Design a protein with these regions (language model features):
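Canonical Radical SAM [4Fe-4S] cluster-binding loop centered on the CxxxCxxC motif
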Residues: 58, 64-106, 126-127
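Glycine-rich, proline-tolerant flexible connector loops at the mouths of alpha/beta enzymes
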Residues: 68-70, 92, 122-142, 271-277, ...
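Conserved Radical SAM active-site core
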Residues: 91-257
Length: 409
């Protein structure tokens, strides 16, 4: 039996090899969700990894990508209180941040000098609805709410620096997203998990209303209705079951089948942090996380799949064996303000690790190449106001030109 000319299928175990469902998956035929779930739960991890790498190689060949970025921590006050988070700060905390636009633009300008292309703008969830300090900060800046500030700041960043904004401000409404459509190449919003159980008393999202799956799903759908490319993802190891991981991935895939706008899914491993309600919880085991990653590739197929390298500093290269094709945003000049205890590896080190696994590391923009080089998709998903900023940066593959990164023009 042959599968689309693929030669390494014979390395599957006998039981896996004889299962017709794997050939349906590879050939993108309709697969019964119950059969798929049974396969993902019961198959040996080495078989799932091999299937995941076959699927990844069909779509991405030997190219692994990353986004060269700066992290603009605009405001870290947040109305939610997730049980695992240290990003959120109270207004009285000396580490509380409320930048003014000139400070944010200065960071973006430093990024441009460092040949970055993405300006990641991160905020807490609707801080002005909980904190008078945040409301006063916005008023002093001449805005009624955070969305107005994000729209204004994004326009200034792209026009003054040429950097492409990618905003992650939580569960935005359709109206709020539309305010960012002409200035942001894409958006970011983690689904985290689609299980309502995780919002119950004592669970990770009990005190985080915006993490209610209904709220997050509404935002994912709104982005789809706007043809707005978005990156989402799951947080693995917050007391979810593997079945809940599968259901979450199936939900993401169903939304993308309808709209085609989910450009990337992040599989993020939970790390307990001191001072949080979950500081004594355990991180997901390595085999479990590998199974989750492989399941993501098998379910999502041609959606880009990322694992943050800074959260698995000693083993992140192994995730290439489970089907990932992207390392996400890596900054040469700013820290990961969400996980400051986990510094990014250098881009040079990521390149070495990637090449040792037989892949080529290339920089991408915060909007994925398929939305740029395909004329039909480009007209739909890339806003016309951004095209003049995008075109000088990319090669024929929709990736960042090497000569730009090397400061040759």
């Amino acid at each position: 039996m042959t599968v689309n000319g693929i030669q390494n299928y014979q390395h599957f175990s006998r039981n896996f090899y004889s299962n017709e469902i794997i050939y349906k998956i590879i050939e993108k035929r309709v697969v019964d969700s119950h059969e798929l779930k049974d396969l993902l739960i019961n198959a040996e991890i080495k078989d799932l990894n091999l299937l995941a790498t076959i699927l990844r190689n069909l779509e991405n060949n030997k190219v692994v990508t990353y986004s060269r970025k700066v992290f603009i921590n605009l405001i870290n006050l947040c109305k939610d209180s997730c049980s695992y988070c240290t990003y959120k700060k109270e207004p009285t905390n000396p580490e509380a941040v409320m930048l003014n636009p000139s400070q944010a633009i200065a960071i973006a300008k430093l990024g441009r000098k460092a040949r970055c292309t993405e300006a990641l703008i991160v905020t807490g969830e609707r801080p002005e609805t909980r904190y008078s300090e945040a409301k006063r900060w916005l008023t002093l800046l001449g805005h009624r709410n955070l969305s107005e500030l994000l729209a204004d700041l994004s326009e200034k960043i792209v026009s003054q620096t040429g950097m492409l904004p990618h905003t992650n401000a939580g569960s935005l409404t359709k109206k709020e997203m539309s305010m960012l459509r002409s200035t942001n190449a894409s958006l970011g919003m983690m689904l985290e998990n689609s299980s309502y159980r995780l919002t119950e008393k004592g669970q990770a999202h009990e005190k985080a209303p915006s993490k209610n799956p209904k709220v997050r799903l509404r935002s994912l759908i709104s982005a789809g209705e706007l043809n707005f490319p978005i990156t989402t993802g799951l947080l693995v190891g917050i007391d979810e079951s593997f079945s809940e991981i599968i259901e979450s991935l199936l939900l993401i895939n169903d939304v993308n089948k309808k709209y085609g706008h989910i450009q990337e899914v992040i599989m993020q491993n939970f790390i307990p942090k001191k001072g949080t309600m979950m500081e004594y919880a355990k991180s997901p085991s390595y085999p479990y996380f590998l199974r989750c990653i492989a399941a993501a590739r098998i379910i999502l197929q041609d959606i880009s799949l990322q694992v943050p390298p800074n959260l698995s500093p000693n083993v992140y290269s192994n995730y290439l064996d489970a089907g990932i094709n992207d390392w996400g945003g890596i900054s040469p000049i700013t820290p990961d303000h969400v996980n400051p205890e986990s510094p990014w590896p250098t881009i040079e080190n990521v390149g070495v690790v990637t090449r040792e696994k037989g892949f080529v590391l290339r920089a991408r923009l915060p909007v994925y190449p398929k939305y740029i080089i395909n004329s039909e998709l480009s007209g739909k998903f890339v806003h016309k106001d951004l095209k003049d900023y995008i075109e000088p940066l990319i090669d024929k593959y929709g990736l960042v030109k090497e000569e730009f990164i090397n400061n040759e023009y």
